[in-house]
Amino acid sequence: MFVCQWHLDVPYGRQGEALRAMEAWGKEKLASSGFRKVKGTRVMVGHIGGSPSHIVDEYVFETLADFEAAIADMGEARFRALSDRLAEFVVPGSQHWEVFRVVG
């Protein structure tokens, strides 16, 4: 089992807009891409000790291959408008993935 977290920062005061854009993209990718294989999802934002401008979009996959296939699907043209909508809220250079293997 793998916990795959997409981390990104948004400009001050834009968290709500960014979360709405992420929600729209999330609904589509969970319905029509390799993200259908996720075992669980959640979205977290900084609260105490973490900046409220930091967002973590988390997915749990059974295999690393399932995660890689889901990410590959995001390159399809049908997702372009959704990713472009979110892009305006992402601080350049802040986005990255962290992948953890569940051991217990």
PLM feature segments, named:
Residues 3, 52-56:
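Short, surface-exposed coil-to-beta transition loops
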Residues 9-22:
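Short, surface-exposed ligand-recognition loops at beta-strand->loop->(often short) alpha-helix junctions
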Residues 44-48:
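Short beta-strand micro-motifs enriched in acidic
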